[in-house]
């Protein structure tokens, strides 16, 4: 496996309701991660200093943090395996989640070279281990399913940030060769995806591409179509000016009893 570990045992069905909460948490983490990246980008743009000075500030910050918190440094591929098979305290895991989000977004926002895919996996793994440790300390679950929670949370984090739930599931399954957990990962991934959709956070890679090119990846395309007004429609006998049409929508012609009517604002649909 690409991440160096595999989980062959699945999660009991009794724990599946708990995964809904994990999915909500991962959706929030994904949205926070995306927004923090652009918050730090705006911060460094506001500083109006040279790129060299920005990198110096980033290096000094990372160096100071690294003296005390080595777990937050680097990509974190070794950390994922440690989180899955070693026991850690709730406070430490929560600190890793928040610290990794802040440090990764800070470095990326400064313009320093580095990716965000592997850090997203580490954030997800840390959040999954945090959820398992918290729930087991409260006596809600048995303390034997850390790897399963790590897998589920990684899928949720990718789905929330990238907005590709199916791809997120496949990536986690293939990188860990843990196909026995496909249903558990699917639940967390879909819930996290829905949370990010409800919060209207665009996919991180689409947003980064738009920021780099200065162009939106969505193009306005002119489309014509015809439709009939059902007799039982709620908007029958409603004036055109009172219709709640989507932005950019224009009614160009109305055909009634074989004749065409100019679509003025006071014309009623029949």
Where are these regions (language model features)?
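Alpha-helical transmembrane segments and immediately membrane-proximal extracytoplasmic
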Residues: 1-216
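Structured core elements
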Residues: 21, 170-172, 226-228, 250-253
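Proline-rich low-complexity regions
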Residues: 70, 119, 165, 230, ...
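Detector for Asparagine
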Residues: 77, 181, 217-220, 244, ...
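Short flexible coil/turn linkers enriched for glycine and charged/polar residues
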Residues: 111, 164, 220-221, 234, ...
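Short alpha-helix boundary/capping motifs
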Residues: 200, 219-220, 268-269
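Membrane-cytosol interface motif
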Residues: 211-227
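Cytosolic Rossmann-like ligand/nucleotide-binding regulatory domains
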Residues: 231, 235-270
């Amino acid at each position: 496996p690409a991440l160096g570990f595999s989980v062959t045992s699945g999660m009991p069905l009794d724990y599946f309701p708990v995964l809904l909460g994990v999915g909500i948490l991962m959706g929030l983490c994904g949205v926070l991660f995306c927004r923090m990246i652009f918050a730090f980008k705006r911060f460094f743009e506001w500083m109006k200093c040279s790129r060299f000075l920005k990198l110096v500030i980033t290096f000094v910050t990372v160096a100071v943090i690294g003296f005390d918190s080595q777990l937050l440094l680097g990509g974190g591929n070794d950390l994922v395996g440690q989180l899955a098979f070693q026991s850690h305290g709730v406070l430490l895991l929560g600190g890793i989640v928040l610290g990794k989000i802040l440090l990764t977004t800070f470095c990326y926002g400064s313009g320093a070279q580095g990716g965000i895919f592997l850090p997203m996996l580490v954030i997800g793994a840390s959040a999954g281990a945090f959820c398992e440790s918290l729930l087991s300390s409260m006596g809600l679950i048995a303390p034997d399913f850390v790897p399963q929670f790590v897998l589920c949370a990684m899928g949720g984090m990718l789905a929330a940030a990238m907005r590709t739930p199916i791809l997120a599931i496949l990536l986690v399954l293939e990188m860990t060769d843990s196909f026995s957990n496909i249903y558990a990962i699917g639940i967390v991934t879909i819930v996290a995806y829905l949370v990010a959709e409800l919060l209207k956070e665009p996919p991180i890679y689409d947003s980064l591409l738009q920021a780099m090119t200065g162009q939106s990846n969505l193009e306005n395309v002119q489309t014509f179509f015809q439709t009939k007004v059902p007799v039982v429609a709620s908007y029958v006998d409603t004036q055109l000016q009172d219709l709640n049409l989507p932005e950019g929508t224009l009614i160009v012609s109305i055909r009634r009893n074989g004749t065409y009517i100019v679509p003025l604002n006071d014309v009623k649909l029949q």
